[in-house]
């Protein structure tokens, strides 16, 4: 039995890390011919890593290609919010159990870090609210991690970690990690697990029958 301390901090009676996820030293999500597989990839979420490991209906983890962290899949701008993370798993210190909260509920509180590292205002929703004369201060956020991936050393450091571990293992690796940030944008990465990356391989070639 392996018992590990939960990585994170206390935020208004909730406990969670700013970022949690899994990383592969070989990118298995090659949806663009320009992606460098050997640069690695991350599948990460805000809050506890349960949503990065377990599939959730209608909620999506952030897929990061470490050769170009700001590269996004070919989706319409209006779909960016749809295909993003909407809910966050946290440990409730008050209820002493795992609970789920909306990202807007959490991000509106003090998270002891620059919230713009992780989320940006949904500009499309903001414009619509202004058209309708609604309170624009309540505009929803999109968890796009844009500032984190474009303005900090986090993606470069994660790429170096994966490359170093893969070199030592002499084999592609799969890791689980968390990251916690401070108000000055400094951060600490916690490596929770590391193991050889399991894949099925290419298998045998299959001959496709011709249509007659």
Residue ranges of predicted features:
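Conserved mixed alpha/beta core segments that line enzyme active sites in large multi-domain catalysts
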Residues: 1-212
């Amino acid at each position: 039995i392996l018992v590990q301390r939960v990585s994170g901090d206390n935020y208004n009676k909730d406990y969670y890390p700013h970022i949690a996820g899994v990383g592969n030293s070989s990118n298995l999500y090659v949806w663009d011919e320009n992606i460098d597989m050997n640069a690695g990839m991350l599948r990460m979420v805000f809050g506890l890593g349960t949503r990065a490991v377990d599939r959730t209906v209608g909620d999506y983890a952030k897929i990061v290609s470490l050769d170009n962290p700001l590269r996004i899949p070919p989706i319409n701008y209006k779909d960016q919010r749809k295909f993003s993370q909407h809910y966050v798993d946290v440990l409730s210190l008050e209820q002493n159990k795992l609970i789920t909260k909306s990202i807007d509920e959490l991000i509106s509180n003090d998270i002891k870090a620059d919230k713009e590292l992780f989320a940006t205002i949904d500009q499309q929703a903001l414009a619509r609210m202004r058209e309708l004369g609604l309170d624009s201060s309540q505009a929803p956020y999109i968890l796009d991690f844009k500032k984190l991936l474009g303005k900090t050393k986090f993606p470069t450091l994660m790429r170096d970690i994966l490359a170093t571990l893969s070199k030592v293992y002499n084999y592609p690796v799969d890791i689980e990690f968390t990251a916690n940030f401070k108000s000055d944008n400094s951060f600490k990465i916690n490596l929770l697990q590391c193991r050889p990356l399991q894949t099925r391989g290419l298998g045998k070639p299959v001959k496709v029958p011709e249509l007659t």
